[in-house]
């Protein structure tokens, strides 16, 4: 998982990174985020930002499929501009990309739930509606 967050999100990102480690994710982060993670005991590999001009950078890792989840919060127009190539490559690679900690927290919770319970079934929304029609309005779907 790649994590790069604005300063005000760093404390909450530490908890998320720790939870991702429990799910066997390897953490890759930009220097500032990695420093904070390491201070709280979360192993994090440092990766270059694209704007730093050093290779490999985060887009290289995305292109090589070395990252399978992205958490990236930004502040200010310059940071948003800088993350354009990151967003583009993430989209092209079909990698889950979270731009808020609320969304990332929900995703991590879902991954934890999935790991804890193997007793689940994936269904399409259409299947849920069909089942509701079959059972009537009192049904629990």
Where would I find each of the regions flagged by the language model?
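ATP-dependent carboxylate/acyl-activation modules
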Residues: 1-98, 104-107, 113-141
């Amino acid at each position: 998982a790649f994590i790069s967050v604005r300063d005000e999100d760093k404390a909450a990102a530490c908890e998320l990174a720790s939870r991702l480690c429990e799910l066997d994710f390897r953490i890759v982060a930009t220097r500032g985020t990695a420093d904070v993670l390491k201070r709280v005991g979360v192993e994090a590999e440092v990766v270059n930002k694209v704007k730093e001009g050093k290779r490999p950078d985060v887009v290289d890792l995305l292109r090589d499929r070395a990252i399978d989840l992205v958490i990236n919060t930004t502040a200010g127009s310059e940071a948003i501009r800088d993350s354009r190539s990151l967003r583009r490559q993430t989209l092209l690679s079909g990698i889950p990309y979270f731009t808020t900690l609320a969304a990332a927290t929900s995703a991590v919770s879902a991954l934890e739930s999935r790991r804890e319970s193997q007793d689940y079934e994936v269904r399409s929304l259409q299947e849920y509606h069909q089942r509701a029609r079959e059972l009537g309005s009192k049904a629990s779907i």
